[in-house]
């Protein structure tokens, strides 16, 4: 029952009559963030021996698509990630490299709409289509737009950097890169070295029941 109540509180709005836009009720942001951590622990955290997409070995694996595609958790992700990036100015669209970024971008888009903010979402393909419009980036055109690149989790920073470069090649300006979970294995340093502002909603040490990540 507590989770249902928490979800309802996420969407509690106060209306500003001057703008006719909803403003986010931020009083319980810490509660919402902790709720997201609980969902990740319950649904997405596995311990064992794993090979990550970066090729690195890990004693744990966080399958964030089990959370980002869950109908209960997606609204929470939308709020947490929106609060992370909402102060960035003049952002038009949010997206990243398929497929980890896709549900994150859509969750932010839907939550933002519920509070009067307009963000389009877009999908960066790993390879350009060879049929139809042969697009590398799907969704509303981002040429000339200011965008935020998102990712569910990042180990080395390579995926969001790739998405950012492709968005720039299309004619977009990248305002920042934002990830839901930073594995604390060098992604921040790589992304900032590449010239992008970096935001992370959670660190892996927020999720693991130990002081440091393996």
Curated annotation (Swiss-Prot):
* Presence of keyword Transferase: yes
Pathway where it operates: Pyrimidine metabolism; UMP biosynthesis via de novo pathway; UMP from orotate: step 1/2
The entry's 5-phospho-alpha-D-ribose 1-diphosphate-binding residues are: 125-126, 129, 131, 151-159
- The entry's orotate-binding residues are 155, 183
Q: Where is the signal peptide?
A: none
What does the protein in this record do?
Catalyzes the transfer of a ribosyl phosphate group from 5-phosphoribose 1-diphosphate to orotate, leading to the formation of orotidine monophosphate (OMP).
Q: Could you tell me what this protein is called? A: Orotate phosphoribosyltransferase
Q: Which organism is it from?
A: Tropheryma whipplei (strain Twist) (Whipple's bacillus)
The major lineage groups are:
Bacteria, Bacillati, Actinomycetota, Actinomycetes, Micrococcales
């Amino acid at each position: 029952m507590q989770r249902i109540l928490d979800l309802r509180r996420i969407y509690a709005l106060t209306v500003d009559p001057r703008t006719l836009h909803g403003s986010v009720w931020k009083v319980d942001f810490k509660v919402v963030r902790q709720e997201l951590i609980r969902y990740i622990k319950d649904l997405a955290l596995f311990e064992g021996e794993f090979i990550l997409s970066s090729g690195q070995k890990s004693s744990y694996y966080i399958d964030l698509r089990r959370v980002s595609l869950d109908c209960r958790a997606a609204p929470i992700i939308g709020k947490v990630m929106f609060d992370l990036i909402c102060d960035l100015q003049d952002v038009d669209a949010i997206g990243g490299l398929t497929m980890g970024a896709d549900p994150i971008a859509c969750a932010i888009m839907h939550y933002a709409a519920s509070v009067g903010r307009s963000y389009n979402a877009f999908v960066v393909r790993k390879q350009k289509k060879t049929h139809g419009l042969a697009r590398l980036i799907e969704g509303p055109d981002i040429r000339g737009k200011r965008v935020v690149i998102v990712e569910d989790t990042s180990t080395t920073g390579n995926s969001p950097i790739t998405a950012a470069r492709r968005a720039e090649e299309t004619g977009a300006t990248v305002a920042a890169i934002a990830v839901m979970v930073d594995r604390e294995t060098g992604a921040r340093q790589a992304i900032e070295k590449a010239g992008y502002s970096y935001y992370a909603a959670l660190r892996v040490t927020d999720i693991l029941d130990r002081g440091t990540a393996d």
